[in-house]
């Protein structure tokens, strides 16, 4: 297969939905950063600010029954998978009402009813699991696929290639999405891997790979839709490398001194949220007042999430002895 340029384009309703989704993710992550600074969120906290177009486009393409798994930068993925933001924020704040009962925190978010399987803190560990999820779909004879997200740093992990080999050997319906935000923690791609075209990493296993502009919502939508169709019809893996960028540090404790202000500013000029907003206005899909109303509704969701989390109890001591399997 080859990705055809502009074969698919979002319709009006999809543009508006994705604008609302991206805005919700942006405001949610900004609030998380604020609460972390206030000491309301502890431990590790990895924000997704700047990368919103990637998951927003994928969620439009996903069909009911498809599954998602990702790394520790997972707030956006679980929210768009269907988990209410208040349960995600409660988890970040260590409350019993959180999606992982307050025991997982930022890096270990789960929502099995919505087929979101984590949230994994070990770099690359989710890739073999995502491959296993795809195996289950094939074994059970469904037409579902698994979207397995990983970062550019995870591509250097050995288990990733073991998973690639099994996925191609058994013909598994999995889309590996490499969110290449240029840095593995503080190490640039150019310093961490010899072959910088990460979408080619599956060639030895017969896996086709494609590179998309993760800052371009329309390109993400078009490319992901074609790839998902191929994987669903042929039950064979594909790798998507999406070139994106995080505006904040690797985590909240990272001042990101390894990159210049000019570099960050260059990427912010292509801010996906600003661009999709302008597309909507230029095509008269919505008015300025319509978009302001969406902003107000998003702010209300964030307000409710904060109030819910602050008023939720901490887990009881008995929870120390539940959900233990080894």
Curated annotation (Swiss-Prot):
Pfam assignment, any one: E1_dh
The keyword Oxidoreductase is annotated on this UniProt entry: yes
Classification via PANTHER family: PYRUVATE DEHYDROGENASE E1 COMPONENT SUBUNIT ALPHA, PYRUVATE DEHYDROGENASE E1 COMPONENT, ALPHA SUBUNIT BACTERIAL AND ORGANELLAR
Enzyme Commission identifier(s): 1.2.4.1
Required co-factors: thiamine diphosphate
Taxonomic classification: Bacteria, Pseudomonadati, Pseudomonadota, Alphaproteobacteria, Rickettsiales
Catalytic activity: N(6)-[(R)-lipoyl]-L-lysyl-[protein] + pyruvate + H(+) = N(6)-[(R)-S(8)-acetyldihydrolipoyl]-L-lysyl-[protein] + CO2
Keywords: Oxidoreductase, Pyruvate, Thiamine pyrophosphate
Any one of the GO BP annotations: pyruvate decarboxylation to acetyl-CoA
Function recorded in the entry: The pyruvate dehydrogenase complex catalyzes the overall conversion of pyruvate to acetyl-CoA and CO(2). It contains multiple copies of three enzymatic components: pyruvate dehydrogenase (E1), dihydrolipoamide acetyltransferase (E2) and lipoamide dehydrogenase (E3).
Molecular function GO terms recorded: pyruvate dehydrogenase (acetyl-transferring) activity
Coiled coil: none
Full protein name: Pyruvate dehydrogenase E1 component subunit alpha
GO cellular component: intracellular membrane-bounded organelle
